[in-house]
Regions:
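Post-signal peptide N-terminal segment of mature Sec-exported envelope proteins
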Residues: 30-53
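Glycine-centered tight beta-turn/hairpin loop motif at sheet-sheet or coil-to-beta transitions
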Residues: 37-41, 75-79, 143-145
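Surface-exposed amphipathic alpha-helical segments
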Residues: 38, 50-52, 96-114, 160-190
Length: 190
């Protein structure tokens, strides 16, 4: 599990990801299962049994490292993950999303699909209506020099004076917009 957390952390900080070889199945063939995140008050479907972990990450906002909770797993040729952390000042949530996106998307280019345009708003019911609540599909070079695709969404939920900052992502060898829509469409704030 330690290796998984290191890989996921690298992906968040530098847009790096695990790239596995193989051909992906249709989304119907993946064994989707619903996972409840009680602390986050969120449901999401994963195509594999996710591992969980926590690590401190400094997003460069001037607040120092924050404790990020992570959940993720590998299915066929892709890594699926969900991460979240609590920002004490909800008024800075849009800024936090911008910093996280900058850390994850640096040096990557957009790869739009028929029904998924990079930078399009992504605001699930119950999420804060923020300009940086978006969906993006980008392509870039992975840690071993291979081309990789990152499908990601960023959004926030207000919790009193705080905000929970949430990021869901798929790292894969090629774009798979249908599977990404299946994964992101399953995100439900309770």
């Amino acid at each position: 599990m330690h290796t998984f957390i290191q890989i996921l952390r690298s992906g968040m900080l530098g847009g790096l990801a695990l790239l596995l070889l193989g051909c992906g199945p249709d989304q119907q063939e993946l064994p989707w299962r619903q996972v409840q995140l009680a602390e986050v008050k969120l449901r999401v479907d994963f195509p594999c049994e996710p591992e969980v972990g926590r690590t401190k990450v400094d997003f460069g906002m001037g607040d120092g490292p924050v404790l990020v909770s992570m959940m993720g797993c590998d299915a066929v040729d892709s890594t699926y993950a969900l991460s979240d952390w609590v920002l004490e000042d909800a008024s800075r949530a849009d800024e936090a999303l911008a910093f996280w996106q900058a850390a994850a998307l640096t040096k990557l280019k957009a790869v739009d699909g028929k029904n998924s345009k990079s930078g399009a708003p992504f605001i699930p019911d119950g999420a804060m209506a923020l300009s940086r609540s978006i969906q993006a599909t980008v392509e870039g070079e992975g840690p071993s020099g291979w081309v990789m695709t990152t499908h990601g969404v960023w959004f926030a939920r207000q919790e009193g004076d705080s905000a929970r900052i949430i990021h869901a992502v798929i790292y894969s060898p090629k774009p798979n917009h249908e599977v990404a829509q299946r994964f992101f469409g399953s995100l439900v704030l309770e």
